[in-house]
Structure formats: C-alpha cells, structure tokens
C-alpha cells in the first residue's frame, strides 16, 4: 500500500462520522482531499460544509458541495482534518499547508475532531516536523527572536502568504515535551496569530491509514 493509498483509506473511513443533514467542518491537505472526494458521494445527504482554506473551498465547490461561512453556522458536529505529526495523547502539529489559523478556528467550533493520517505521521515526541507559526508581517523579526529564546530555530517560509495575509515562521529543533504549555507560550508572543500546536484542542478520534487497513484510536 502506497502512502497515498493509506491517506485515501483514512479519508474515506472518516465518512462514517458524518451525520446526515449536518454541516461538516473540513480541513486542508492531501489526506483531506481524499475525504472531500468521499464527502461528495453523500452531498445530497448533508447540508454542506465549512472550510478551513481557500483550496478546500474551491475543491468542494468544484464537486458540488455547498460551502458555508463559519459566521453563519452555530455548530458543527464534526471537523475532519489531517496532521503533520500526532502523538499518543492526540496532540498534533499542523500547518504544513499554512492554513493553521483557520483550521484551529473551525476545530474550536466542532463537537468532535476526527484526525485522518497515514501511519508516517504518528510520533512519540512532537517536533521533528518544524512547528509553523503564523505571524503578522511587521512582527516577523521580533517574534523570531522570542522563538529563539524558547529554544527553537525559526525560519521564514519564503514566498508563502496565508489566506489571512500573514507570513509563516517554521520553528526547527523543538523537542516538544509539553505541547499544551508551549502552545500557550507561543500564542502569548505579541504579533503571533497562532501556532501549529493543536494540544489544548486535540483530536477526539484518530483514523490511521496503514498497510493493514485503517486503525481507529480514541
């Protein structure tokens, strides 16, 4: 089974968590694209979706899935999204696709977070994948200096502007032993919009695509 086939298996497995006549929160990325393909097969049975990125919005519109603005929606039963890394406590690093802020907002609204990954994303300790931090452009140098004080090596992700008009600093060499605390610490830095640690709001269900099929962890 290739990595993409494992992603596809996890994406399609998430369909069973989608309730009829509901509005579904949809994340961003290669694994989520498989979920969107799956969601399109039951678009007549759901009201529609709320998207965490312009890319996912476009894909859903192309497939005929109605997309709602989050401000017009009071509740979401589920949010389905991938992760760049996830540990045994369901803490994640996300934001490789630079959509972390909108992902975190939609996840906060949803009753249940369903994380879909292939088995290469499971780790014991978070931090080998660089931690993305979304930053107001004028604060880039200041935020970078503060991140160095926290033990990281921030690198400006050149050529990338987020859907919110901001920039990304990728923080390398962080051994993240207390994700909840670090998430809060970084978010307190003036100029930070948010960071890619999803620990204070982690996943509720993890669907892992593997050579042996999809494993469910709760």
From Swiss-Prot:
Pathway: Carbohydrate degradation; pentose phosphate pathway; D-ribose 5-phosphate from D-ribulose 5-phosphate (non-oxidative stage): step 1/1. Substrate binds at residues 28-31, 81-84, 94-97, 121. The keyword Transit peptide does not apply. GO terms for cellular component: cytosol. GO terms for molecular function: ribose-5-phosphate isomerase activity. CDD domains: RPI_A. One of its GO terms (biological process) is pentose-phosphate shunt, non-oxidative branch. The active site is at 103 (proton acceptor). Its EC number is 5.3.1.6. Homodimer. HAMAP family: Rib_5P_isom_A. Belongs to the ribose 5-phosphate isomerase family. This is Ribose-5-phosphate isomerase A. The gene is rpiA.
